[in-house]
């Protein structure tokens, strides 16, 4: 019997170092340099030849599945197998009613804002301008709950100044939105019924531009992070750097900052704006008030940032990247929205994320850089850009298809994939091969999030959305047993299990905006909360479940079994 270490088309015979009742153990030492090492193993037993790579034992050689070792690449130890909890702040808990967005405070996407008075009301189909009042004080008030649940990391959806409740259209990267922070100076008027221009929304302008409100909000956020750290929890922020919002002070399409003290003219307002090159304009003859700018996917509410044409913009965003992970905030990392879309060329995209990683790790070496990405992330996971990704392809999708037969938006049902263990393992192995071990150990493993239907709704195996089937249908025919099975997989699979707020309380919902319902305080499913707490406890007590490798044990009709191993620790 012989075992070979195969690297760069060279075979090196390995030395048998140990034998026990079950296995023979072989080793081989290799001197690393600065280059990535890709390798696999060849095993000869009598007349039988086979190979071992990320798929396990196999009969063929495929470079895609080779093991990868990147010298010097490490991901934060605290994130390996950590339990994340995603908070969509407006819908979590209202701890300070004085900062609530008011009805008629300003105009947003064709209509005026609405303050929702009934916390238990479900979001409207166009719920982007509805505000429930959840805020950072509410998170502080519920810290005991999060700690008792076993949360290791709080992941916040965007918190920076923004006119929407989702806040993926950032208005000011330097400050936490006072509507989720603190409003200490509150003057001005609401919009009158016949007013539709936000330059007259003096109450809103005062709230989001007055430095007293902005600085007090940043101070409150620093307190939230400090409190989380005192309880042994980490905090990561959502960074939206591919685009900003049309309300942004650099663009100022709403003319909010045009006459506000201490602010420059926005690029929409004036051609000589210092922010002109932050955006790409198609018609240089439309100033003042030039709306001919590039929007992400054509959305004029989401101006695309034009990094390649502005060193000042690049420098500023890299400053923001450093600012929030350094003192006094000391955030523990970034989740990066639509990260692969940033810039206008693949070359610039990779250049930027290398710079982003460099400045973040210089400011806080233990910070995580985690990207939203659909498709293979392999090109970005080479040790000098992202640490990891939201794990759609190698977790959310295979688990959803196997247990429910549903697509993650509830847009399709596939009977041939439900309970199909071979398809499950094939997807997990194929997409998991895009990760090195350090990246896989910290991958964000979600069942639900703000962009997809709630997993509990998917268990009803019903194709639909809010506009087609209505709210009630999201809760009809749901299967708690299937959801428990999903949570069990989530808490035992390699990576960082991530709970979307309210999933643990039995929340249902179609894809957005219905998946952004308010947390049902006082109406929680206590059995589901206890089950999450129980499974999280198992996850945290068994080292193999936090950091161990995974091996397929069984694949059958509606049946999967797997083992996790980490040194002397094993689990099945």
Regions found by a protein language model. Name each.
Residues 87, 146, 156, 173, ...:
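Conserved, mostly hydrophobic/aromatic
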Residues 89-152, 159-328, 356, 362, ...:
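Substrate-binding/active-site clefts of carbohydrate-active enzymes
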């Amino acid at each position: 019997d012989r075992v070979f270490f195969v690297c760069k088309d060279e075979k090196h015979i390995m030395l048998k170092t140990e034998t026990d009742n079950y296995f023979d153990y072989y080793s081989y030492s290799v001197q690393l340099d600065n280059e990535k090492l890709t390798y696999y193993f060849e095993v000869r037993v009598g007349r039988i030849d086979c190979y071992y790579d990320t798929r396990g034992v196999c009969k063929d050689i495929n470079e895609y599945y080779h093991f990868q070792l990147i010298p010097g690449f490490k991901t934060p130890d605290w994130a390996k197998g950590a339990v994340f909890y995603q908070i969509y702040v407006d819908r979590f808990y209202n701890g300070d009613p004085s900062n609530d967005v008011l009805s008629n405070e300003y105009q947003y996407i064709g209509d005026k804002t609405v303050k929702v008075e009934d916390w238990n009301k479900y979001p409207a189909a166009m719920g982007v301008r509805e505000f429930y009042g959840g805020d950072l004080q509410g998170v502080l008030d519920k810290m005991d709950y999060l700690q008792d649940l076993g949360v290791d990391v709080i992941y916040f959806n965007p918190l920076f100044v923004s006119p929407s409740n989702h806040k993926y259209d950032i208005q000011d990267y330097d400050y936490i939105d006072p509507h989720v922070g603190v409003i200490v100076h509150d003057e001005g008027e609401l919009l009158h019924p016949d007013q539709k221009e936000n330059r007259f929304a003096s109450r809103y302008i005062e709230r989001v531009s007055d430095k007293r409100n902005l600085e007090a909000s940043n101070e409150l956020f620093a307190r939230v992070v400090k409190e989380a750290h005192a309880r042994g929890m980490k905090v990561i922020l959502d960074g939206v750097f591919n685009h900003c919002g049309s309300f942004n002070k650099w663009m100022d399409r709403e003319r909010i900052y045009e006459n506000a003290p201490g602010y420059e003219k926005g690029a929409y307002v004036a051609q000589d704006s210092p922010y002109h090159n932050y955006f790409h304009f198609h018609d240089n003859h439309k100033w003042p008030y030039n709306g001919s700018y590039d929007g992400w996917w054509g959305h004029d509410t989401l101006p695309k940032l034009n990094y390649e044409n502005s060193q000042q913009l690049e420098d500023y965003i890299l400053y923001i990247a450093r600012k929030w992970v350094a003192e006094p905030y000391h955030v523990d990392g970034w989740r990066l929205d639509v990260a692969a879309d940033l810039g206008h060329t693949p070359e610039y995209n990779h250049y930027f994320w290398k710079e982003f990683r460099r400045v973040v790790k210089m400011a806080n070496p233990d910070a995580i850089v985690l990207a939203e990405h659909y498709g293979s992330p392999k090109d970005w996971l080479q040790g000098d850009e992202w640490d990891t990704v939201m794990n759609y392809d190698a977790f959310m999708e295979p688990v959803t298809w196997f247990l429910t037969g549903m697509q993650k938006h509830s847009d399709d049902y596939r009977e041939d994939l439900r309970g199909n263990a071979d398809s499950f393992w094939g997807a997990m192995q194929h997409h998991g091969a895009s990760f090195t071990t350090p990246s896989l150990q910290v991958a964000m493993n979600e069942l639900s999030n703000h962009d997809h239907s709630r997993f509990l709704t998917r268990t009803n195996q019903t194709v639909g959305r809010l506009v087609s089937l209505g709210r009630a249908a999201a809760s009809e025919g749901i299967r708690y047993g299937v959801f428990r099975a999903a949570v069990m997989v989530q808490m035992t699979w390699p990576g960082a299990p991530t709970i979307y707020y309210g999933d643990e309380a039995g929340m249902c919902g179609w894809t957005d905006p219905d998946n952004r319902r308010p947390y049902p305080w006082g109406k929680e499913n206590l059995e589901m909360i206890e089950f999450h707490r129980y499974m999280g406890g198992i996850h945290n007590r068994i080292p193999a479940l936090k950091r161990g490798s995974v091996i397929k044990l069984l694949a059958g009709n509606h049946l999967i079994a797997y083992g996790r191993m980490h040194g002397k620790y094993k689990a099945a």
